[in-house]
């Protein structure tokens, strides 16, 4: 599960009350918030990969991966840092991280087909060091712990579009993140559904905003909008 954008429209930063609790933010439920949708999507993608060796488009575009990689390089993040890709999907982000020299990379997805695809993609690229597991981040296994960096590129968005009690699932996500991220660890999140302030409000317990990464902004009608928000949080000690 990677990208849960509810729409492709530009999101106005002034659209919602910046002090509104995430539990009160009501997105229209979507098939993008269901496991069945992603199982079917990755079944199709795996079939295409087996036939042609090609993966589908990178969610949020390749610039989303470049943005993360550039930030990690800029801040001299140690290459052996334990990293977890939450909802790894086809595993392309982990492959790019491995190519950049990072050596302690893990990825989870609740779709077994996604994990199968990610393993196939990594193998094709000659990368055999990735630790890939089928796991539901909302109900993490005991081995999911003590990561120095966690990355989310669309999974939090998808969960917010669930038909079944999304507010509770988002709270579980937050708690799971606090459980697996080391004190002082970093959380990088890319979202197309949530504004900066909404994400800060949601993750304010146990996490502090470290930086907002630059993304394209749009100005119209006297307002500012964006299609994606990328934030870096730090786990409080």
Segments the model singles out, each with a brief description of its role:
Residues 1-40:
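N-terminal auxiliary segments of SAM/dcSAM-dependent transferases
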Residues 166-183:
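A short glycine-rich, Lys/Arg-flanked "PGG" loop and its adjoining helix->strand segment in the class I
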Residues 58-81:
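Conserved alpha-helix/loop element of class I SAM-dependent methyltransferases that forms part
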Residues 184-191:
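Conserved beta-strand signature within the Rossmann-like core of class I S-adenosyl-L-methionine
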Residues 196-237:
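Class I S-adenosyl-L-methionine
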Residues 138-150:
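A short acidic, Gly/Pro-enriched loop at the edge of an enzyme's catalytic core
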Residues 148-167:
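A short SAM/SAH-binding and catalytic strip from SAM-dependent methyltransferases
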Residues 82-84, 89-140:
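Class I SAM-dependent methyltransferase SAM/SAH-binding core
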